[in-house]
Amino acid sequence: VFELPSYEQVAEWQHNQTGIPGQVRVLSDICNYIATESKSDTNVYWSVENNGIGEAALIVINDFGEENIPGLFVSEPIRKGHVRKFRKGFNTTHGTKITACSRLKTMVENDKMIIRSKPLIGELKSFIATGSSYTAKSGAHDDLISATLLALRMMEVLKDWDPRVYNTFNQTEEFEDYTKITHDKDEPNLIIIKGTSTEYFEARRRISKIVRKSSL
């Protein structure tokens, strides 16, 4: 559970032996608690994946009654060229996972997201790049990370609805895509940086060296 627009984790529930009906009841209880404490359900947002086990969750939510869960059930926008029947929630693919992982990495590295959960921090420590994707090390789990990635995808949708989320989310995106360093031909002291956030700070360090040399 994350608070916006601070991106601070405020709660967490994890239990791998609870069936999907039980999970939906817990989701409802959490949303009810937030709505009661905040005295409003208009700022409560929740969602689920709609592929894999998530398909079963959609069936249970339908039986449980979406109207019985406070807040808004957030779904990804219909993409251009989408041919399948629309389903609520978020469909996780290789591409969407990579994008969400990249954003999570950027936000954590730049202190844009505050993680309070020790179990989640433990999962992050064993979450590694494997080939062209990310996965937990052998024997480790990534359930909490998957939930966080879903929360990030929800935030990406919410930024188009709430200007406060839009502003903070866009500030985070400014740290992304910073690898390649090139000199501008017209402005020799102007350096364009593109690539990953990790290399952004390395690029800034190199810029400082260049500026110091040019001032000598």
Language-model regions: role of each:
Residues 1-4, 146:
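Generic N-terminal initiation segments characterized by hydrophobic and/or small/turn-forming residues
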Residues 29-30, 66, 124, 144, ...:
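Solvent-exposed, non-transmembrane amphipathic alpha-helical segments
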Residues 62, 71, 128-129, 149-152, ...:
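Short alpha-helical interface elements
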Residues 152-216:
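Acidic two-metal-ion nuclease catalytic site recognized across multiple nuclease folds
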